[in-house]
Amino acid sequence: NPFLEAFGNAKTLMNDNSSRFGKFLRILYREGHIVGASMETYLLEKGRIVGQGPMERGYHIFYQMCQGLSSAEKSKLGLQPATAYKMLIQGGARAVNVDSIDDAKDFREARAAMTTVGIDASQQWELFQILAGLLELNNVEWKSTGRGSAGATVKGVPSTAVMQAKVANKAVLAKAAELLGLRSDSGPLGLEYQLSMRMNDSASKTGSVIYRALDPVQCRDAIAALTKHTYSIVFDWLIVQINDRLKPEMGDDPQSYIGILDIFGFEIFEH
């Protein structure tokens, strides 16, 4: 599946198209005939989304977008070359463009496959917006304010506690927030505030929650966590779309299945 590979496969040292998630595929049968299928996935390698080893890449889809989207589409997203994004060059600049990988061609195939399983053009564009937003978000830089304090939330509305870290490149944060459909301001409901404050899990008897100011390193960690969680949700949504397309027709209730377990990580092919 080209688009499942785009979102779940990556270049490693041993394999330029390594699956970085496990899956269990059920091929459903009724009276000796295949009537459908279903897929479960697990153990998506989330760490690879924001960090890669030397000469390795993140998930293909990010590099494919940078190569395969039209100039007009890139302009709408504000998309730059892959080498401009910190999230994509952790493995080194030489790992970004690989001779054995045609990202533009693979992107066209992934896009066509998404259409085949019923993900329409508007849904695809929303996916690209989210992914472009994550790329921008990971280019956000933080600086210390040299101060910081805690604040309380009452009835779900945070107070304006003093932040310990501030965004140094506001335009990048604003672009990321726009693509992700979020507010970028430093007010209590803005993305900058939410990334730079941590909520204390223990609420008081009055229903208030304590927010603690984070330092720049912790803010970067918060962005990494948000990025991994968001990408995981996108990946799970894609699996739902595939299963909806593969499910049996009405009246073709399966009587049995053949299960195929595919575990990622087998990259030594000597035997």
Segments and roles (model prediction):
Residues N1-H271:
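Alpha-helical bundle cores of large, well-folded domains in eukaryotic cytoskeletal
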